[in-house]
């Protein structure tokens, strides 16, 4: 508007832009409680004053795309939590921008007209939550916090590499922690003396596309045909996100383990988000690759079992007679 009316471009003047932005921010806040706001800046650029009015309707029109995009994280949160919006009991507003009437209307409409919970100051909601969690961690037993529980989740799936480079997840993404789970695996070759346990985090079907956290070897497995040894792998993640992975040969009781802390090769928040997006993008390709490897492994197992059958002493004579 300034450029159109006064034929001046203030884009190259950081000070003028800063003053304009501050005035617009003030007007935005005014529009949360009023239907119209004034923007008045003396000597904005080259001695020219800037005065204008903006209505709430015009503000909502200008920011329509931004307002609509605020629903994307809401939908994503429900999708990740595997919840329907009808299962949400209360909608708490967090952050100053949730005071904008249009944002509140979009939220209420999204949740089928449900009334928003405005009992907490949006600017203080995060601090309230942090204070409650601090009280719980410090052992506070008062009635105010005894019914509250903050649950953390695993940000990415955790698993190991199995035959063909496949990612086999033991702890799925968004599993509530602390948690512990075990799964039994076996050997891939005859008389295999040991197994390499490689621990990964990520959402892709193949480990080459995920993040390696650590690895260790379980050796001393007694000689046996493939598929016979029973190796129990256990993933145990505590409330602090520290992961303990162990592998034990059931026949001998021999085991080995590794501890992976949050600061040891773990991905940042941005990297986690990127990995989740890539998993969505390449989901079809990953599933096809996983199916190909599963078919290959099944064929190899069938061929191995057929070979064992043919070499069985009891059947050799019958096969020769035939």
Curated annotation (Swiss-Prot):
Domain of life: Eukaryota
Family (UniProt): Belongs to the heat shock protein 70 family.
InterPro entries: ATPase_NBD, Heat_shock_70_CS, HSP70_C_sf, HSP70_peptide-bd_sf, Hsp_70_fam
Entry-linked PROSITE patterns: HSP70_3 (PS01036)
Note: Heat shock protein 70 is a major immunogen in a microfilaremic individuals from a filariasis-endemic area.
Organism: Onchocerca volvulus
Keyword tags: ATP-binding, Nucleotide-binding, Stress response
Disulfide-bond pairs as recorded: none
Biological process annotations from GO: response to stress
GO function terms (MF aspect): ATP binding; ATP-dependent protein folding chaperone
Pfam family, one: HSP70
Keyword Acyltransferase: no
Gene3D superfamilies (alphabetical): 1.20.1270.10, 3.30.420.40, Actin, Chain A, domain 4 (3.90.640.10), Substrate Binding Domain Of DNAk, Chain A, domain 1 (2.60.34.10)
SUPFAM superfamilies: Actin-like ATPase domain (SSF53067), Heat shock protein 70kD (HSP70), C-terminal subdomain (SSF100934), Heat shock protein 70kD (HSP70), peptide-binding domain (SSF100920)
Protein name (database record): Heat shock 70 kDa protein
């Amino acid at each position: 508007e300034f450029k159109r009316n006064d034929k001046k471009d203030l884009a190259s003047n950081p000070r003028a832009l800063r003053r304009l932005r501050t005035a617009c921010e003030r007007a935005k806040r005014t529009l949360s409680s009023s239907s119209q706001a004034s923007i008045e800046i003396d000597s904005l650029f080259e001695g020219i004053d800037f005065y204008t009015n903006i209505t709430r309707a015009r503000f909502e029109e200008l920011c329509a795309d931004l307002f609509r995009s605020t629903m994307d994280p809401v939908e994503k949160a429900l999708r990740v939590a595997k919840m329907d919006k009808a299962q949400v009991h209360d909608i708490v507003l967090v952050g100053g921008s949730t005071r904008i009437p249009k944002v509140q209307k979009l939220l209420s409409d999204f949740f089928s007209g449900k009334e928003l919970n405005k009992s907490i100051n949006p600017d203080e909601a995060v601090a309230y939550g942090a204070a409650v969690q601090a009280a719980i961690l410090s052992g506070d037993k008062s009635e105010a916090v005894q019914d509250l529980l903050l649950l953390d989740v695993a940000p990415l799936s955790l698993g190991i590499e199995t035959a063909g480079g496949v990612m086999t997840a033991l702890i799925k993404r968004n599993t509530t922690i602390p948690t512990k789970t075990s799964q039994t695996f076996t050997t891939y070759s005859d008389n295999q003396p040991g197994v390499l346990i490689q621990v990964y985090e990520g959402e892709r079907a193949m480990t080459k596309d995920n993040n390696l956290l650590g690895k260790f070897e379980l050796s001393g497995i007694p000689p046996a045909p493939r598929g016979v040894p029973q190796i129990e792998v256990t993933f145990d993640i505590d409330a602090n996100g520290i992961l303990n992975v162990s592998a034990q040969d059931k026949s001998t009781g021999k085991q080995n383990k590794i501890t992976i802390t949050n600061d040891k090769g773990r991905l940042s928040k941005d990297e986690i988000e990127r990995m989740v997006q890539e998993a969505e993008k390449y989901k079809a390709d990953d599933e096809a690759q996983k199916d190909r490897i599963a078919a290959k492994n099944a064929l190899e197992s069938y061929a191995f079992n057929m070979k064992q059958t043919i070499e069985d002493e009891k059947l050799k004579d019958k096969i020769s007679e035939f």
